Swiss-Prot record:
An MF annotation (GO) of this entry: G protein-coupled receptor activity
Gene Ontology terms describing biological process: adenylate cyclase-activating G protein-coupled receptor signaling pathway; cell surface receptor signaling pathway
PANTHER family in alphabetical order: G PROTEIN-COUPLED RECEPTOR 157-RELATED, TRANSMEMBRANE PROTEIN 116
Name listed for the protein in its UniProt record: Ascaroside receptor GPR2
Gene for this chain: GPR2
Disruption phenotype: Decreases cAMP levels following exposure to C.elegans. Decreases trap formation following exposure to C.elegans ascarosides ascr#3 and ascr#7.
Disulfide-bond pairs as recorded: 99-173
Quaternary structure and partners: Interacts with ascaroside receptor GPR3; may form a functional heterodimer. Interacts with guanine nucleotide-binding protein alpha GPA2; to activate adenylate cyclase and positively regulate nematode trap formation.
Lineage, opening ranks: Eukaryota, Fungi, Dikarya, Ascomycota, Pezizomycotina
Length: 406
């Protein structure tokens, strides 16, 4: 009896691929939908950077690099899944070239997003950790963090293509051996997750100590290694966010520096700037409500770009706690979405058995959804929403005679 096409046995392929053509079709339909969501999330981050000047800080330039990689990876997944949904089959010999290209791009962008995540964490630590020389260097040589992820990922993908080759694994083409994918991609990714966890734990401790000083009014010991640490609440942007003539400038950078001076007074920051066209000066403000002897607790605002005119930012415990919690979201998010794929690689690589279809769909969806997760972690925040609201207002309203009118 002739088997129906959608029931054809495909167990001769990679373990990661479904055993039947019907299962493969279900997998590809699910992955195409997830990849579409990821591409929308990544495009949101890219579009936000392009349209909103407030989201063009140095750190956002690195996030842009991650978003571009996520977007390209999502489009690559949409291509492979769409190819199979439309009636093609990347597992066939005649599709070998397309499969090799798809596998190469998959390897490039999976590795690349790993390195982008690490680069962002390291850059954040350098800036928040008050490493002034290193911070100035990386911010004046923006191209260096951009080159690293691209060069490393392309080299690794090229070596894998030459030594192992790429084949269809269900949904897309990649390294067909679960054990090889585990060794080349998953173990390095977990090392990166551990590294960024350690980095953000250190930053969490920095912010937590700052919060403790703010609550208790306790200044750091002169010998404390935290004494010269700066906690940046807002990033430095390339251009001022300015409404001409209205005197409204929104804060760009707030650096809370706990020096070797202290007091028991609540801390706040006063930000000043000039509002003349093309005029930007360094704003430095120190506030202290009370002094004890020769020790005074100061909060310094240092920025080469304009800050809010006469605007005060209370640095209360809730703010510092929120910042500390947000830092820990990054490693936790990546650990969650990669836990299932890693477990499946270990299971299939050691037992040689194929996982059930529904587990395969969940497994691959966790990989494809990374673009959406990155968009939520890095791109969906109050600052982005406020930036979009202001951007829409600028489109709706005209600026005439130095004042905004309807």
């Amino acid at each position: 009896m002739t088997q129906l096409p959608y029931l054809l046995d495909r167990r001769g392929g990679a373990l990661a691929a479904p055993a039947t053509a019907w299962g493969d079709m279900m997998l590809n339909r699910a992955l195409f939908s997830v990849a579409l969501l990821s591409s929308v999330g990544s495009a949101w981050v890219v579009l936000s950077y392009a349209c909103i000047k407030e989201l063009r800080s140095y750190r956002h330039q690195l996030i842009l690099g991650l978003a571009i990689s996520d977007l390209l990876m999502s489009l690559n997944f949409m291509f492979s899944a769409g190819w199979n949904v439309a009636g093609g089959d990347l597992a066939l010999e005649e599709s070998r070239t397309a499969c090799s290209v798809n596998g190469f791009l998959t390897q490039v962008f999976v590795v690349q997003t790993d390195w982008w995540i690490l680069v962002i964490a390291i850059a954040t630590y350098i800036i928040l950790g008050n490493f002034k020389t290193q911070s100035q260097f990386i911010q004046t040589h923006v191209w260096i963090p951009w080159v690293g992820p691209w060069v490393l990922s392309i080299i690794i993908a090229a070596i894998c293509h030459g030594v192992l080759g790429y084949g269809y694994i269900g949904g897309w083409c990649w390294l067909t051996s679960d054990l090889m994918r585990l060794l080349i991609n998953f173990i390095p990714r977990w090392l990166i997750v551990i590294a960024i966890a350690l980095i953000y734990i250190r930053l969490y401790m920095i912010v937590r100590k700052a919060r403790k000083w703010d609550i208790e009014g306790v200044s750091p010991d002169p010998g404390d290694d935290m004494a010269d640490t700066s906690v940046i609440l807002m990033s430095v942007g390339k251009k001022d966010r300015e409404r001409q003539g209205s005197g409204v400038l929104v804060s760009r950078d707030v650096s809370v520096s706990f020096g070797r001076k202290g007091s028991t007074a609540p801390t706040f920051v006063t930000m000043v700037t000039t509002s003349g066209a093309g005029d930007s000066r360094e704003a430095i403000s120190s506030c202290s409500a009370r002094e004890e002897g020769s020790r005074a607790r100061t909060v310094n605002v240092n920025s080469s770009r304009s800050l809010s005119l006469g605007m005060r930012q209370p640095l209360n415990a809730a703010q510092l706690k929120r910042i500390a919690k947000k830092m820990m979201v990054y490693p936790v998010a990546y650990a969650i979405i990669w836990a299932c794929p890693t477990a499946i690689r270990i299971y299939q690589g050691t037992t040689g058995s194929r996982a059930p279809l529904w587990i395969t769909i969940v497994d691959k969806s966790c990989i494809v959804i990374q673009g959406l997760v990155d968009a939520v972690v890095y791109g969906l925040n109050e600052r982005a929403w406020q930036g979009w609201r202001d951007h829409i207002r600028r489109i709706i309203y005209k600026n005439e005679g130095g004042r905004i009118i309807g």
